[in-house]
């Protein structure tokens, strides 16, 4: 039976390195002696329920670790469940009971080190690159045991679409990129390509691929994966020249101006491209060359395949200017830089520079890297340099941290959302006003936050290595990963400020004030001239450079950008900080808030909403925007943008009283309701909070009461809320799964609601 192990308890490895004793580390292990018949029955029931309801909800409820923790803590829900009838008025006691039920349920799910574990996946291009890399390096069996394979072979077939393909994520239409990758993954996992043609995942996927022209229509990322495996040719890829890393800082585009995730991925890809690395052919690789194309492999004209992309994958169309640019880069890169004397003078120097960057960034992130996609290419680059090198072995030791097991099987995560989920849950707990009931949980959560703050900048001369400051920030996953994120920093700092204001006899140990100042310095530093806040680094690149992006299935992938969600969170925390520490950088903070408010206002859409870059979508961003504006002192009565936001939400409230937004809003950049105007508890919680923040309870409380009824009646017997549609997104077109959002935003909304009802008593 699968068990989730936390932190140092997850085992040790001589090639692992850590900055904080593996705080937040999550490892799944299979223990043959760890289950009773009753526990096994419970797990199998969860798997059957997911399979039976797959047509309705595509994402797992992330139940396996939850069931494990609830068993280990002998959790029993003692607070009665509340049900509100149609004509019934909600009382404060009923709302508070629902809130407390949910809080006590989540308290039982806290890990020993203070964080809340959770899946952070959903993308269908995470699993296959790991399998391909481990197959190439000969370590597939080392990492993926028979039990791992069993779970992966549960996951990939059950997630496929009805047409036989796989989408970019578990809810999206089929794409060439993910269908090709998952087909290869199944074949490496020894699934027969032709067995039972009507039902076989491989047979149907292969038909889907061939019917649409074959694997030459895979986007660039997919082509790179196929090239290193040896089932595609590098000459059929857009160029990824390592010479890019030699560009001086005064160039309009250089290693320091690009988006950190693009940088992390492409530094490793450029090394592999510059070396023209290709795996040693195996019988399977030779078979795949025959299976992935409608014509023979020898007949493919690779130069013609370079710009191909299936219509199903083409979200960001490549213009004539882009095609001309990349054709010119290819000619210069391959016809000049790859020939004597430039190959020795420039290309080999560029490859060494790319490798230097890879090693630096690996060490700075404890070999976690920036996530599931760059991790694979970094690991493969280190193996290509030296199969027995310590660099590669350190990478291999970190692979287990990317694996997640749920009732739908095994999937690879981005790199975890431990800090993000934990800080949002702590804010909910603190807002519930039941501190005495959950004191030990709050203390553990606060301890996790304190220990997770980044207290140093990246090592060495980090500017030369294209890194920015990190001191004072908090990351998305854990301290070891080391990338500070501005929204995680804002929310974490606000949590710490709340704890700072508590009596000393309630919180055993408080944060050093200087570390609070460090966090403020980080937030002030990251603000752009336009008043907005980026996520990881300053948004310093010229926006026109996005026109040259080679990425076909996502948008805004070249540069760091400002986001309304990050900006709103920063306004909230800096407003609170200024009240608690009125003498620290007050004028700068006031200027920051004024500029941020103007930025938020400038991004409001014609319908009164804001576009969400990190969640689905307009409701998500409207919550963070209005929260920031209200913190800055703006009101419904005095500020038109808040009135327009409220009107937007009231207009789209459904007949049931809830809200539910389709993920199609993200790529379409226009609000679209869920099919059938269904309700989603996450969106309902977000919209409900906006209404309460704006004073809707004083104007007309009925829309809020209707929404509260939806949330209260949605709560399950044990205090959980139902898992519905995916609510995370990035780069406009790819969904991410945050299963804890169903608890966070439902309960957070109920904290607002109970306080509003209490004022009426």
Swiss-Prot record:
It comes from Arabidopsis thaliana. This is Putative pentacyclic triterpene synthase 7. The active site is at residue 487. PFTB repeats lie at residues 149-190, 593-633, 642-683. It is an enzyme of class 5 (isomerase). Pfam families: SQHop_cyclase_C, SQHop_cyclase_N. The keyword Isomerase applies. GO terms for cellular component: lipid droplet. One of its GO terms (biological process) is triterpenoid biosynthetic process. The lineage of its organism: Eukaryota, Viridiplantae, Streptophyta, Embryophyta, Tracheophyta.
